[in-house]
Amino acid sequence: MSSAFTVVIPARYASTRLPGKPLQLIAGKPMIQWVWEQARKSSAERVVVATDDQRIVEACQGFGAEALLTREDHNSGTDRLAEVAAQLGLAADAIVVNVQGDEPLIPPSVIDQVAANLAAHTEARMATLAEPIEDVQTLFNPNVVKVVSDLNGLALTFSRATLPWARDAFAQSREQLPEGVPYRRHIGIYAYRAGFLHDFVSWGPCWLENTESLEQLRALWHGVRIHVADALEAPPTGVDTAEDLERVRRLLEA
């Protein structure tokens, strides 16, 4: 099966923790431009920014990116992607990769990897990536999403909680990682087949998705298989807060 794919970058202006986040300047360029440039370095046939704000559309046009204006009332980035897939008239079996608009350091290799993984695993309707958790602070951080997979590499669940809970080890100490437990951090990049996006939107959010604020749980709730692989090149964490923004600025302005 072909692994040709389209990248869509959802970019909301009204971020709760960092308003106007896609347009925040990093080394003289808006953050969304950094993300777009990284996506353009991948093997994607097309890279599209999907936004709910005309200011972001105009900024994208200024540096040559294709941008589509979408509705403001989407429940998640995946819901926004579904609108874009419909606007673009993508075939049901076309692969779409969701690259978060706050990942200015995302390696192009992981974009290619997640698209290729979905193409290779026809039993899955979504694919995503993970990396090992190597310190206990990360493990207990609710801003870090944990993922557990089965022996075939399909997701069993995702959670902000410490998952799985090593009962005996944590009864002794929570100061170090339990031995023999392969804890993994979910990396928020997804590949889908365009036809699946229509189904995803039609289902609407479930209580589990709303409780954890994790859109992928809607797919699991409906029995969708999600393929999870360890990233060949783990990306740095994205920009969620003003502190994250300053960290990325220091890296890219050095």
Swiss-Prot record:
Enzyme class: transferase
InterPro entries: Cytidylyl_trans (IPR003329), KdsB (IPR004528), Nucleotide-diphossugar_trans (IPR029044)
EC number: 2.7.7.38
Gene Ontology process terms (BP): CMP-keto-3-deoxy-D-manno-octulosonic acid biosynthetic process; lipopolysaccharide biosynthetic process
Keyword entries, A-Z: Cytoplasm, Lipopolysaccharide biosynthesis, Nucleotidyltransferase, Transferase
Annotated GO CC locations: cytosol
Record carries keyword Repressor: no
Locations listed in the record: Cytoplasm
GO molecular function term, any single one: 3-deoxy-manno-octulosonate cytidylyltransferase activity
Catalysis performed (reactions): 3-deoxy-alpha-D-manno-oct-2-ulosonate + CTP = CMP-3-deoxy-beta-D-manno-octulosonate + diphosphate
Keyword Hydrolase: no
Protein's pathway: Nucleotide-sugar biosynthesis; CMP-3-deoxy-D-manno-octulosonate biosynthesis; CMP-3-deoxy-D-manno-octulosonate from 3-deoxy-D-manno-octulosonate and CTP: step 1/1; Bacterial outer membrane biogenesis; lipopolysaccharide biosynthesis
Superkingdom: Bacteria
Sequence similarity: Belongs to the KdsB family.
Alphabetical list of PANTHER family matching this protein: 3-DEOXY-MANNO-OCTULOSONATE CYTIDYLYLTRANSFERASE (PTHR42866), 3-DEOXY-MANNO-OCTULOSONATE CYTIDYLYLTRANSFERASE, MITOCHONDRIAL (PTHR42866:SF2)
Function recorded in the entry: Activates KDO (a required 8-carbon sugar) for incorporation into bacterial lipopolysaccharide in Gram-negative bacteria.
NCBIfam families in the cross-refs: kdsB, PRK05450.1-3, PRK05450.1-5, PRK13368.1
Protein's UniProt name: 3-deoxy-manno-octulosonate cytidylyltransferase
Native species: Pseudomonas fluorescens (strain ATCC BAA-477 / NRRL B-23932 / Pf-5)
Name of encoding gene: kdsB
